[in-house]
Amino acid sequence: MKTNQQPKAVIVIFGATGDLAKRKLYPSIHRLYQNGQIGEEFAVVGVGRRPWSNEDLRQTVKTSISSSADKHIDDFTSHFYYHPFDVTNPGSYQELNVLLNQLEDTYQIPNNRMFYLAMAPEFFGTIAKTLKSEGVTATTGWSRLVIEKPFGHDLPSAQALNKEIREAFTEDQIYRIDHYLGKQMVQNIEVIRFANAIFEPLWTNRYISNIQITSSESLGVEDRARYYEKSGALRDMVQNHIMQMVALLAMEPPIKLNTEEIRSEKVKVLRALRPIAKDEVDEYFVRGQYHAGEIDGVPVPAYTDEDNVAPDSNTETFVAGKLLIDNFRWAGVPFYIRTGKRMKEKSTKIVVQFKDIPMNLYYGNENNMNPNLLVIHIQPDEGITLYLNAKKLGGAAHAQPIKLDYCSNCNDELNTPEAYEKLIHDCLLGDATNFAHWDEVALSWSFVDSISETWAANKTLSPNYESGSMGPKESDDLLVKDGLHWWNI
């Protein structure tokens, strides 16, 4: 493996002038270069509709990575090239192929090509098919296709898109990116579970009461309103990011730590999810939309007052739900999920609540005890907190809650890789473990479609939670009726 730690490839970015490329892709490639994870045998070709030059792209790259801190920035950006492009014109692909061949000769790259689609999804199928038909993927090295979400709008559209792409690329060449799978603590879920004897035997319905996943954002829709109006929180967050976390939390131990075995176990979880019938949606799921309020003391508008949002919009900006997994390990254990915009804070965390001990001798009027909790902090802080009960200081045998903390990103000297940095490097190495397989995508869409169809038919949603809160009251009621509550810790 060490001989391949500096992969040699040309990275072609479709949508090179866009926001994702500037915010995430260019800084991530730069960090890989700085850290020696890619050497000098690489090139990046940015394609887009704008009539840019190589220098225009290089200046954009410098701006996006705060280049003043890197004295080698010109060496880095010299690897970047721009190619004006029309995705519907076969001639553009032929010209691109000529450029790629030239760059592979210049940088001694063995015909390895990574195509990153960071643009509007309606062009994904066209690009994939034309790359093949014009011979851009016909190389002696490898060709890989990286696809950003959304992968379809529902199961039928996802199936149609997958069929188009599979005409040009095989499944093992397709890397469907979910940046949550690149986050360090999401990847740490498997290690916490399978490398610790104090957790692995307890990770069942015998000892776990419930699992809660919260992914909250304090921002509103910002400049994504046009996309969000078609998507909503269910499609934007639940179908991909949250379903992936559920699968990692619930999967059986894989036979080996390789791509095929891990994906296989995740697929089994998604197959075991209890489907939500349309007449049960209101029992298991809650939706919300933010109205005006304050975030950190600053007034913010309601969703329907945001730019490019219809004043009578029925789009949900909040989702909470109860998921049940019908298998031997998890029967009877609810997985509660919630995600939303304009909430109290930006935070993603997982809370595993363990069951109480039968006839606990320390429950009583003098004791303020909580159940044992394992909290996995995904962002912005990355770490683990374990909540236990211990004896109070003093003579009486009274107990009190205590916590044990580990923070993985609190050390300023530790340069934690960004999610995109890790995923781009994984793709260059051919490691698809942290990318979504088609089976996972299809099963996730199959689960959420009945919910989205029910909500689409019932256009009664109105703003029902204040900006700066943790969501609508109905979200709390979802747990209260089960004798539980959200752990806001």
Curated annotation (Swiss-Prot):
The active site is at residue 241. It is an enzyme of class 1 (oxidoreductase). It catalyses: D-glucose 6-phosphate + NADP(+) = 6-phospho-D-glucono-1,5-lactone + NADPH + H(+). Disulfide bonds: none annotated. It holds the Pfam family G6PD_N. SUPFAM superfamilies: Glyceraldehyde-3-phosphate dehydrogenase-like, C-terminal domain (SSF55347), NAD(P)-binding Rossmann-fold domains (SSF51735). Keywords: Carbohydrate metabolism, Glucose metabolism, NADP, Oxidoreductase. Pathway: Carbohydrate degradation; pentose phosphate pathway; D-ribulose 5-phosphate from D-glucose 6-phosphate (oxidative stage): step 1/3. GO terms for biological process: glucose metabolic process; pentose-phosphate shunt, oxidative branch. NADP(+) binds at residues 15-22, 49, 86-87, 149. Its EC number is 1.1.1.49. One of its GO terms (molecular function) is glucose-6-phosphate dehydrogenase activity. One of its GO terms (cellular component) is cytosol. Substrate binds at residues 179, 183, 217, 236, 341, 346. PANTHER family: GLUCOSE-6-PHOSPHATE 1-DEHYDROGENASE (PTHR23429:SF0), GLUCOSE-6-PHOSPHATE 1-DEHYDROGENASE G6PD (PTHR23429). Belongs to the glucose-6-phosphate dehydrogenase family. Catalyzes the oxidation of glucose 6-phosphate to 6-phosphogluconolactone. This is Glucose-6-phosphate 1-dehydrogenase. It comes from Bacillus subtilis (strain 168).
